[in-house]
């Protein structure tokens, strides 16, 4: 199945897929660095963990802005140059985080990183899916999405190798040089998507308007979240998120034109993002704070879970090529349900590692199908924008997860013997698995659809 998908690849196809995978891996690394050092940053700035969890919320909440802005640029100027720009920007903003003197500056740096991070998935997925042959899309989808747990795995190793010697600030410095080298590799070795066509005319003024709009919305969100989010929690976070959803729906032409598909895809991606972020983002904190494990044990468990994630993503994405996108995701989402209690309630390092391994097989097994499924459903002329934007709007809704889980963990509530972070992890995982299975059951499938040549993004 996977071996057949690897046959007969051209050099251009190999480089395109490698670029998309590595771009998403490095992006995920820069994101997950924070999840390992939240207790250290909370101590540095003399705040509690929910206040630092706001940085995760902020990073996720602003990603739709990057998906829209960079997606439009990629539809008009090509996937390759905008992918390079994206990688350089998120590497620079990730590096800048290390020098934040105050919590507010730290949050602003993570917000800017989130905008750059928002563009990378949609552009990389479009480049790879438009380049490879249809029969290889399932495997490539799983490979591309495995970049996310690969980045998490590298962050796990970096935590074990760097944290003790250089602290949390040193962790944020690691990604800069790899980012520059990756951008250079794409510039020298990667070809433009064979599907993308340069528009006859590109209205530069349109992109200025988009950029100004993104800057205004980003500034407003940063102001609300930083001013009120730390003290008032979810109420003000939702107050910042809801207007952005309204603006996105009203002002984005391709969402207005394809609103039924967009609403469906956003709800679907809301479930997917709760599934991943709800089982991953606070997991290192769960290991450090609730179980009091040392750096080596945390590294071991997170490496094991990410191996499971990579295996699950590659296997089930490849399976979807013959079994179907919808049926594969429904199967894996339902498989997660009996695993959740064991995963959240285990007490020893060995049992926690086993539970995390099984859980992430399910989580990334479902996620592995997402790149190909969204790109097959997307309208061709705005594929670079549509897939990335609906993905990140789902991320926007799910961005409340980190603060919600941190506050629930510290509330003292108990259910079925679960408490603290165990309860917070289990509640979100169960909700997300059921939502994903329901949405996939209700939704369409476009397996192996002919993507054709993308027309200019004139909307």
Describe each PLM feature range.
Residues 89, 93-96, 104-112, 350-358:
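Paired small-residue
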Residues 109-146:
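Cytoplasmic helix-loop-helix junction between adjacent transmembrane helices
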Residues 65-103, 323-326:
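Conserved MFS/SLC helix-loop-helix module at the cytosolic interface between two early adjacent transmembrane helices
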Residues 57-72, 124-125, 303-315:
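Central cavity-lining transmembrane alpha-helices of secondary-active solute carriers
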Residues 144-187, 204-210, 223-236:
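Helix-loop-helix hairpin linking two adjacent transmembrane segments in secondary transporters
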Residues 34-35, 214-244, 248, 252-310, ...:
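Extracytoplasmic gate region of multi-pass secondary transporters
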Residues 1-31, 36:
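Cytosolic juxtamembrane N-terminal segment immediately preceding the first transmembrane helix
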Residues 320, 326-370:
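C-terminal transmembrane helical hairpin of 12-TM major facilitator-type secondary transporters
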């Amino acid at each position: 199945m996977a071996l057949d998908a690897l046959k007969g690849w051209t050099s251009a196809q190999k480089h395109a897929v490698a670029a998309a995978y590595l771009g998403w891996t490095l992006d995920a690394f820069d994101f997950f660095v924070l999840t390992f050092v939240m207790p250290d940053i909370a101590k540095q700035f003399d705040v509690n963990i929910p206040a630092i969890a706001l940085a995760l919320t902020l990073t996720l909440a602003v990603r739709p802005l990057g998906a829209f802005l960079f997606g439009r640029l990629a539809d008009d100027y090509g996937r390759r140059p905008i992918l390079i720009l994206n990688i350089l920007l998120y590497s620079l903003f990730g590096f800048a985080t290390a020098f934040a003197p105050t919590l507010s500056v730290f949050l602003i740096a993570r917000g800017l990183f989130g905008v750059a991070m928002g563009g990378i998935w949609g552009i990389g997925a479009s480049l790879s899916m438009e380049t490879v042959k249809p029969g290889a899309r399932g495997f490539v989808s799983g490979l591309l999405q495995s970049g996310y747990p690969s980045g998490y795995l590298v962050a796990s190793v970096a935590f074990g190798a760097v944290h003790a010697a250089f602290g949390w600030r040193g962790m944020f410095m690691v990604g800069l040089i790899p980012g520059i080298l990756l951008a250079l590799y794409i510039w020298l070795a990667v070809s433009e998507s064979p599907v993308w066509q340069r528009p006859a005319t590109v209205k530069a003024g349109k992109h200025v308007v988009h950029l100004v709009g993104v800057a205004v919305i980003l500034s407003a969100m940063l102001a609300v979240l930083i001013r009120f989010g730390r003290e008032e929690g979810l109420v003000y976070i939702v107050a910042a998120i809801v207007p952005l959803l309204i603006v996105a729906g009203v002002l984005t032409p391709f969402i207005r034109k394809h609103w039924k598909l967009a609403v469906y895809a956003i709800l679907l991606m809301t479930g997917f993002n709760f599934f991943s972020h709800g089982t991953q983002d606070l997991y290192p904190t769960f290991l450090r704070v609730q179980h009091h494990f040392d750096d080596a044990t945390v590294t071991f468990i997170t490496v094991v879970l990410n191996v499971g994630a990579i295996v699950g993503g590659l296997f089930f994405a490849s399976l979807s090529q013959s079994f179907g996108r919808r049926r594969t995701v429904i199967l894996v989402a339902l498989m997660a349900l009996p695993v959740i209690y064991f995963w959240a309630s285990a007490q020893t390092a060995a049992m926690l590692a086993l539970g995390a391994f099984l859980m992430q097989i399910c989580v990334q097994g479902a996620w592995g199908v997402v790149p190909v499924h969204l790109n097959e459903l997307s309208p061709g002329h705005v594929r670079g924008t549509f897939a990335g934007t609906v993905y990140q709007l789902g991320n926007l809704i799910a961005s409340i997860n980190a603060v919600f889980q941190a506050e629930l963990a510290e509330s003292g509530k108990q259910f079925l013997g679960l408490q603290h972070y165990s309860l917070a992890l289990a509640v979100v995982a169960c909700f997300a698995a059921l939502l994903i299975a329901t949405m996939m059951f209700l939704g369409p499938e476009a397996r192996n659809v002919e993507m054709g040549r993308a027309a200019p993004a004139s909307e």
